[in-house]
Amino acid sequence: MSKIKNYIPKSCVLAGVDILTVITENKQNAGNLGKSSIANGVIQLQSLDYGIEISNTQMQNTYFHELVHQMLSSIGELELSENEKFVQNMRNMIFEFLRTADWIRLEEFKHNKFSDADSNAPFIKEGIAEIK
């Protein structure tokens, strides 16, 4: 399945709230590439930073950074949401996972299209991880 390269969600639902992604050109707020409001249901991304167009990767990074803020705020973790180091680390983990995940249709997986019988991959048996 395809990866998320050059994509961001135009909308989503988070904790029952519809979230819309919008692009702005706020030249007075240069250096701040995005902001979000769970109350308003918006993730706002800048198209320019000090007059220079934001790259696709920067825009994706900013989107997921703001999404982590919204996730934390929606579950009442306001202190963590204000911790930029924590937010950035969570963004790194989520974005890396989404960017590199190799997706398979669940029906293919269920029908043993990728069986562990042909590999040395770890598998789970009765709740205990075993390695062949």
Residue ranges and their predicted role:
Residues 1-57, 74-132:
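Metalloprotease/metallohydrolase-associated module, dominated by Zn2+-dependent proteases
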Residues 61-73:
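Active-site recognition of the HExxH zinc-binding catalytic motif
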